[in-house]
């Protein structure tokens, strides 16, 4: 009579653990992920990912796609769509009529975007008004360090790149929350409403602009001080935010997780875990059929 263990052995199949079956593959994966972590740290937004990807593509011999130009098998090209997405290809030996193979991934990730007129002051604190992008758990975005990324188009048409909070010595930003012993009413909310979307406003300053020649001071002096600092850093004014694309993301770096360092903790792995691997797979493609 066949025992249950014998039947299980003969009829079932268990996916092998790569760390047990192939030590070399595990070591290769660890080495590969060093580049992946570096990419996660420096390509947190669509624009940054696109720019970093173009650098890697150019280094690998890819050139911008030219419409109407004839290409031969093995030619490597890329096309950038308005600085926020891109396509890349190695031409295969088969004609287009034989079909194509596509590998697609999205490079945007959940974040906090600034509203068009975001700067305001309340109770002698200056804030940015935000609206969340993507499927976020809003309570996860409070009391964590945030970095400011994006671009601003000035009145003269100049594009200004903005990044604050990623480099050593940079200030960071945050969304505040109530102390546990002061949040009794908040504690009664359902999990999804613990922090509401309209409460995801970012602290940008608490010191007023001081003008010793003005005895009474000015209205919204903390807001003015924040704007003065931004003007000093980037030469922008409040009106320039109407032509801006500013995003706030966690100001953290990718790190190994666990004593065995077998996991990666980082912002933006949805879906850069697919986008980065698609990018490197394309670069590694040499002589495809399709």
Describe the predicted segments one by one:
Residues 1-290:
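N-terminal hydrophobic/helix-forming segments and targeting peptides
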């Amino acid at each position: 009579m066949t025992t249950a263990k014998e039947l299980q052995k003969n009829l079932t199949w268990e996916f092998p653990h790569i760390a047990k079956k192939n030590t070399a593959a595990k070591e290769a994966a660890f080495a590969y992920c060093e580049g992946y972590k570096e990419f996660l740290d420096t390509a947190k937004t669509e624009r940054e990912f696109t720019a970093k990807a173009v650098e890697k593509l150019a280094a690998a011999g890819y050139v911008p796609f030219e419409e109407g130009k004839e290409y031969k098998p093995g030619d490597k090209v890329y096309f950038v769509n308005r600085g926020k997405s891109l396509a890349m290809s190695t031409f295969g030996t088969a004609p287009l009529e034989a079909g194509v193979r596509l590998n697609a991934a999205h490079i945007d990730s959940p974040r906090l975007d600034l509203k068009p007129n975001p700067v305001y002051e309340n109770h002698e604190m200056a804030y940015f008004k935000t609206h969340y992008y993507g499927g976020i758990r809003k309570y996860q975005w409070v009391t964590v360090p945030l970095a400011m990324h994006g671009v601003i188009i000035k009145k003269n048409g100049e594009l200004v790149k903005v990044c604050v909070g990623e480099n050593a010595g940079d200030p960071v930003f945050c969304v505040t929350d109530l102390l546990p012993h002061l949040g009794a009413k908040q504690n009664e909310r359902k999990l999804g409403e613990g922090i509401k979307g309209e409460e995801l406003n970012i602290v940008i300053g608490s010191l007023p602009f001081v003008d010793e020649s003005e005895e009474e001071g000015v209205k919204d002096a903390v807001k003015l001080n924040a704007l003065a600092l931004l003007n000093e850093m980037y030469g922008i004014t409040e009106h320039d935010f109407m032509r801006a694309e500013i995003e706030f993301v966690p100001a953290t770096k990718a790190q190994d997780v666990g004593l065995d360092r077998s996991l990666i903790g980082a912002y933006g792995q949805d879906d850069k875990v697919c986008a980065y691997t698609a990018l490197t797979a394309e670069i590694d493609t040499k002589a495809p059929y399709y």
